[in-house]
Amino acid sequence: ILELRARARRLKDRHDVSLVIIDYLQLLRSPSRWGLDNRQVEVAEISAGIKALAKELSIPIVVLAQLNRNPEARTGDSKGKPRLSDLRESGSIEQDADLVGLLWREEYYLDDDEERKELEGKAELVIAKQRNGPVGAVPLTSLKSITRFEDRAFEREEPSR
């Protein structure tokens, strides 16, 4: 986290960057926790440090993070659908974040090939937290071949006859 902080400050000073993206949170380490084995406390420190850095530099910092395995164990209509509580290793991530978006492709969790085919290419960006706005879901198109998501609202529709 110290190296990240120094690098972000340098980039802001030299190049006036307006956004920092961290891929991904669980790869970072906190020097004050080296040698200790409480990863949740360490992730909480890192999360708070990133939040403080964003405020200091007055820029948004987008942080990618892994989820735990809980979504895979869910059944019924919400099978696989991620929730805030699924953020891996710390509840502090959801506390510190201004916005939490979770990507979900229902087809990934289906066993039936026919159901899978019906949902192929469909995804959702679940806005699970938004400090200054509404939560909900944004329908997306998943382009797996190029690892890209697009807003489904802009898909071309066939004209009705």
Locate predicted features.
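Catalytic P-loop NTPase motifs of RecA-like helicase/translocase cores
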Residues: 28-29, 70
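…and closely analogous acidic/polar surface helices at protein-protein or active-site interfaces
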Residues: 42-47
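C-terminal regions of RecA-like/P-loop NTPase motor modules
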Residues: 1-19, 34, 48-58, 69-161
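Conserved H-loop
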Residues: 64-66
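Conserved ATPase-coupling elements of RecA-like P-loop NTPase cores
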Residues: 29-36
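Conserved Walker B
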Residues: 25
